[in-house]
């Protein structure tokens, strides 16, 4: 008889004996020359159990299972160094300290361990972005890019239903520094919003020296905040004010400063030139 047949016959006999004693063996591998001992009192120690089971053979190891606090769970395993008849030990009715022990073959449970699969991360294709400068060397920057035009379509076939196409929303990536604006407004319907500008006017004035010296030039900065939006009269005032240069003329006769805008100055100058031209024409005609 081969070793496999003896092991199978022994396992079948041990299972029958265990069922007859009132418990069912778990699935696993039967350990040779090892006996399961149940019903151990918490007052029993390994030395007493070793001395008791030496009648069946040379005891190699006694292992009592305990919890985290070190208290016995009431069962353990006894290993023999020699070949012993495990069936004979299981069939025998053994009482220890007035308590009947539950005997059976030692079975090691089969632990199913699933090896985790390695995680593979796919990196996107690097994008070579070259930046050239006349006064510096070329720099190459590696960064992923997403096309703003490309659309991705993913097909998900199922055996119980026809294939489905799920269209994903394209993602756009805008490069900084490159802007192109193409307005689509019809003619004469565009409206502009201007932020509130702050203008600073420098008034150049000349103060008269009371001692009779030369006029002293001075500069008086004045801040003025003007709001403008659309083509309304307020915007017209802003356009005129941005081009206005205020002149300060000193009138020695009246002893006061008169402020004349550029518009009034040009108007007076134009009238002066017209009058001068008329006088020249009259002289030539004479």
Curated annotation (Swiss-Prot):
<dbReference type="GO" id="GO:0005737">
    <property type="term" value="C:cytoplasm"/>
</dbReference>
<dbReference type="GO" id="GO:0008354">
    <property type="term" value="P:germ cell migration"/>
</dbReference>
<dbReference type="GO" id="GO:0007283">
    <property type="term" value="P:spermatogenesis"/>
</dbReference>
<feature type="domain" description="DAZ">
    <location>
        <begin position="155"/>
        <end position="180"/>
    </location>
</feature>
<comment type="subunit">
    <text>Interacts with the C-terminus of pabp1 and with epabp. Prior to oocyte maturation, found in a complex with epabp and pum2 proteins and spdy1 mRNA; pum2 dissociates from the complex during maturation.</text>
</comment>
<keyword id="KW-0896">Oogenesis</keyword>
<dbReference type="GO" id="GO:0045948">
    <property type="term" value="P:positive regulation of translational initiation"/>
</dbReference>
<keyword id="KW-0810">Translation regulation</keyword>
<keyword id="KW-0217">Developmental protein</keyword>
<dbReference type="InterPro" id="IPR043628">
    <property type="entry name" value="DAZ_dom"/>
</dbReference>
<dbReference type="GO" id="GO:0070935">
    <property type="term" value="P:3'-UTR-mediated mRNA stabilization"/>
</dbReference>
<dbReference type="Pfam" id="PF00076">
    <property type="entry name" value="RRM_1"/>
</dbReference>
<dbReference type="InterPro" id="IPR035979">
    <property type="entry name" value="RBD_domain_sf"/>
</dbReference>
<dbReference type="GO" id="GO:0008494">
    <property type="term" value="F:translation activator activity"/>
</dbReference>
<keyword id="KW-0744">Spermatogenesis</keyword>
<feature type="domain" description="RRM">
    <location>
        <begin position="33"/>
        <end position="114"/>
    </location>
</feature>
<comment type="similarity">
    <text>Belongs to the RRM DAZ family.</text>
</comment>
<keyword id="KW-0221">Differentiation</keyword>
<dbReference type="GO" id="GO:0003730">
    <property type="term" value="F:mRNA 3'-UTR binding"/>
</dbReference>
<dbReference type="GO" id="GO:0032019">
    <property type="term" value="C:mitochondrial cloud"/>
</dbReference>
<keyword id="KW-0694">RNA-binding</keyword>
<dbReference type="InterPro" id="IPR012677">
    <property type="entry name" value="Nucleotide-bd_a/b_plait_sf"/>
</dbReference>
<dbReference type="GO" id="GO:0003723">
    <property type="term" value="F:RNA binding"/>
</dbReference>
<dbReference type="GO" id="GO:0048477">
    <property type="term" value="P:oogenesis"/>
</dbReference>
<comment type="function">
    <text>RNA-binding protein that is required for primordial germ cell (PGC) differentiation and indirectly necessary for the migration of PGCs through the endoderm. May promote meiotic cell division during spermatogenesis. Shows a preference for G- and U-rich RNAs and probably binds the 3'-UTR of target mRNAs. Stimulates the initiation of translation of mRNAs through the recruitment of poly(A)-binding proteins (PABPs).</text>
</comment>
<dbReference type="InterPro" id="IPR037551">
    <property type="entry name" value="DAZ_RRM_vert"/>
</dbReference>
<keyword id="KW-0963">Cytoplasm</keyword>
<protein>
    <recommendedName>
        <fullName>Deleted in azoospermia-like-B</fullName>
    </recommendedName>
</protein>
<dbReference type="GO" id="GO:0007281">
    <property type="term" value="P:germ cell development"/>
</dbReference>
<dbReference type="InterPro" id="IPR000504">
    <property type="entry name" value="RRM_dom"/>
</dbReference>
